[in-house]
Amino acid sequence: MGEKEDLFEASASVVGYIYQLRKALYACIERHGRGLDWCIAIEAGDDIEEITDRGRVLSQLKHRATGVSLTDSSTDLWKTLRIWAHAITHERVDLDGTDLLLLTTADLPAGSVGFLLQPVASGVRNEDRALEALVAAREASVSRENRKAYEAFDKLSEAERRSMVARIQVIGHAPDIDAMEALLLEKVVPAVGHQYAESFLERLEGWFYRRTIRQLRTDEMDAITGEEFDQVFTDLRDQFRPGNLPIDDDIALLEPDPSDHVDMVFVRQLGLINAGGAQLRIAVRDYIRAFTQRSRWSDENLLLPGEISRYERRLVEEWQDIFAEMEDNLGAEATEAEKVAAAKEVYRWATREARRCIRPDCDEPFVAKGSFHILADDLRLGWHIDFLARLMAVLEPAEATSA
């Protein structure tokens, strides 16, 4: 039973943390395009801390199951108050320039502290009644779980309590983690359209999570600034323009082990031209990156119908020009050394000079270089003048044996 409870608590913590990140990302997207003078941090001054030219907002987030209510004795309420009271007592927060926000997916019972501290626009806000209810709840409760929160509350003077309550806003029945994903998708649709919204958001969230981890592992304040977010958002959006395709960092950094691919045809092709170890490593790297990136584009429907086929046709036809020139220059009496030297020039052209982009603005080198290796693996092109005959002589007997 204990293990199940621990697993439930761990799962709830993970959900709560992802919820926190999604709310922070939503806040960034909301501010995007409305100026750069802001920054946001996770688990710095609070769950989420926002600093703008209008002041500071400290937010506590509580993700709870459907049907849960935020009562006056709720642990969620008092844990939040404990954090804020502690910050006030230790002079880590200036209430004159700070808003305190408690956002919860729980319901706010009528007349409760949370209900009475909703934003002014709700029409029910009453700070005096809310403070009275807090004091009454504190005096009536014997909760051990809330003991430290009560002690922190007791340390506040009457004036400090009133000042704190005046800065608190409670938002109940907030969108849960799934609803937040839907809201995020709505936010990015204007940037990339409905067709690419999910792919765009997946990449933006990935960057945001990695960036947040970096911030959490840094001792000093390393908040995400408006300028930084604007650059990332804009750069990523541009990758979804009609003339571009997204290049994913996790793929662009792949470094596969060449020894895992020694039997592949494109590697055998390099063996025919006596390619060195460094060239083999780079070739395998480019092949894997291009293959993986192209597969992801296809899986996410980011490609136009027949786009890969048309791209490969262009590469093959360009190669045909270079290869035909090599054949003419070598002639029938060429030695093996001359053939290898000429093949190296063809390979050099493919990897150093041919930069045919799949789309005008998608100029990542591994896409073209790796696509050449994909074609070489299918024997649709090669480097050595006799590549087809030599490889077929090796591959066909092997295929017959395996059959």
Task: Label every PLM stretch briefly.
Residues 51, 59, 326, 388-391, ...:
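Extended hydrophobic/Leu-rich segments
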Residues 2-7, 11-29, 375, 402-403:
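Basic, amphipathic N-terminal segments that precede the first structured/catalytic domain
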